[in-house]
Swiss-Prot record:
Function: Fluoride-specific ion channel. Important for reducing fluoride concentration in the cell, thus reducing its toxicity.
Regulation acting on activity, per entry: Na(+) is not transported, but it plays an essential structural role and its presence is essential for fluoride channel function.
Family (UniProt): Belongs to the fluoride channel Fluc/FEX (TC 1.A.43) family.
Binding site for Na(+): G79, T82
Record-given protein name: Fluoride-specific ion channel FluC 2
InterPro entries hit by this protein: FluC (IPR003691)
Catalytic activity: fluoride(in) = fluoride(out)
Keyword Transmembrane: yes
Domain of life: Bacteria
Entry's localization field: Cell inner membrane
Entry annotated with the keyword Membrane: yes
Organism: Yersinia pseudotuberculosis serotype I (strain IP32953)
Amino acid sequence: MTAIDVMWVGLGGGIGSLLRWWIGLSIGKVYKGNFPLGTFLINISGAFVIGYLSILFSVDWRDRYGDLMNAAVLTGILGGYTTFSSMQLDAAKLATARGRAIAAGYLIISVLVGLAAAAFGAWLAY
């Protein structure tokens, strides 16, 4: 790892985080429901893009952090864009406000749809 690698990951992470913030804010202005739609759509779209680009970039999953494009785009931008921690916070809020079953359903749906989106993105890239 070099200083330039750290710079690319940090720059990508900043870009991804800003995209997540802007998209989440935009969705929140339009959607006023109880479902955490912003986090859901951000994570699903991120899963799709990472599935697609991982094939396009020929990612070797045993050494997926070494290449500059992987570091800047997959780890940096998409790592900053997607948000596991916000999904967990949303689930905790759902559990308090609407019950544990709703929260568990949200987590299960998020994971399954995310896996399907990543697989679909990878399939499209082949």
